[in-house]
Amino acid sequence: MADPARARRLAKRIGAIVASAIEYEIKDPRLTMVTVTDTRVTNDLHDATVYYTVMGQTLSDEPDFAGAAAALDKAKGVLRTKVGAGTGVRFTPTLTFVLDTMADSARHMEELLDRTRAADAALAEVRQGAVHAGDADPYKESAAEEPAAYEDDERRPD
């Protein structure tokens, strides 16, 4: 088992090496819109998981997730060689690439919050003209309404 601080430093270094290699050294056009978001290394330093996102060419374009995954799988050996040369560790970790869904989750959360805000605004608009049903204090009883059966009874409320 390695020191957790060492594993974090190695993960950060691996992420930087992989991101740099994808941007400057690997000439696959499917990797032009790939961004490395996070890297995790196991405690034994033998396996590294690289999280990535894929953006579309424009805001309205759908990203090519399958193409990016295939390109990363194809370039896995070259990237591992670059990581081995750049880190200088005894055993170069195997690389696993995982699509990071954090951006999609955040976008979905924002949509849910927007819908909730709209529902709250509609409810506040309805509440503006609303009045309470019934009397101001429906549980208040007047002395004249008190039943006569209690006059001689010990159960009479005080």
Curated annotation (Swiss-Prot):
In its UniProt record, a GO molecular function of this protein is: ribosomal small subunit binding
Q: What is its main location?
A: cytoplasm
What the entry lists under SUPFAM superfamilies is as follows: Ribosome-binding factor A, RbfA
Q: Record's Gene Ontology CC terms?
A: cytosol
Compartmental location: Cytoplasm
Q: Compositional bias (Basic and acidic residues) at which positions?
A: 134-143
The domain of life for this entry's organism is Bacteria
Query: InterPro entries from the xrefs?
Result: KH_dom-like_a/b, RbfA, RbfA_dom_sf, Ribosome-bd_factorA_CS
Give positions of region: Disordered. 127-158
GO BP terms:
maturation of SSU-rRNA
For this UniProt record, give its keywords in alphabetical order, as a comma-separated list. Answer: Cytoplasm, Ribosome biogenesis
Q: Report the Pfam families cross-referenced here.
A: RBFA
Q: Which Gene3D superfamilies does the protein's record reference?
A: 3.30.300.20
Q: What does this gene product do?
A: One of several proteins that assist in the late maturation steps of the functional core of the 30S ribosomal subunit. Associates with free 30S ribosomal subunits (but not with 30S subunits that are part of 70S ribosomes or polysomes). Required for efficient processing of 16S rRNA. May interact with the 5'-terminal helix region of 16S rRNA.
List the HAMAP family hit by this protein, alphabetically: RbfA
Record's subunit section:
Monomer. Binds 30S ribosomal subunits, but not 50S ribosomal subunits or 70S ribosomes.
Provide the family line: Belongs to the RbfA family.
Record's protein name? Ribosome-binding factor A
Taxon lineage: Bacteria, Bacillati, Actinomycetota, Actinomycetes, Mycobacteriales
